[in-house]
Amino acid sequence: MMEEYGLVLGYLPLGKPNAIQREPIAYIIGKKFFTLLEAVIKKDLKLKSEDELYIGKDLEKREKIDRIKDRVTYEELTTSAKSEIKEVIKKIIISRENEFVNFFNRCGPISIRQHQLELLPNIGKKHLTDILNEREKKKFESFKDISERMEHFHDPVDILTERVIEELKGSRYYLFTRPPSQKPKFEGFEKKRYFRERKRRW
């Protein structure tokens, strides 16, 4: 599940103030899984928010990216990147309208008591019932169609954006984003075994 393209959230042309090695850094959000990345940018380039960059495996196509440093969390973003993220996510969602409209048409229950739609902000039992009834009559065709057919329903793009941000901050369920990377738990015996096996490899 690797990202191919991403949009710039923030750019530090002089790098991080506290970094030992100062190099131009960009914070990027993937267009497919909304993965948050920290990347080193090639020298003498200028970037701005919402610039689209190739971040896939083909190194020859990476015209502006020197290398991907790491996947980062929402909390690790700069204040500037956090201020841009909502509008950038909206832009991505609008560009993938068919996929997200199909989510409303195809999503199903998580359990006996809960439906995927109820994970969206401001979607309670009444809205859930209304959406299911409407899509049974006719599949939704666009964001505009959803808004027009659902009385008192907020802008679906805003609702989806809020859900993506919630997942990026950390959530029990992940509908649209990649779950956080699992880091090894160094507790008791597991910690000792990890370092013992690592020592053998050396």
Which role fits each region the language model picked out?
Residues M1-I92, E187-W202:
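Structure-specific DNA junction-binding interface
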Residues K91-Q116, N133-W202:
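C-terminal extensions
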Residues K42, H115-E118:
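A structural connector/turn signal
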Residues G124-K125:
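Small-residue hinge/turn detector
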Residues L128-I131:
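Conserved hydrophobic/aromatic packing and binding residues within compact polymer-binding modules
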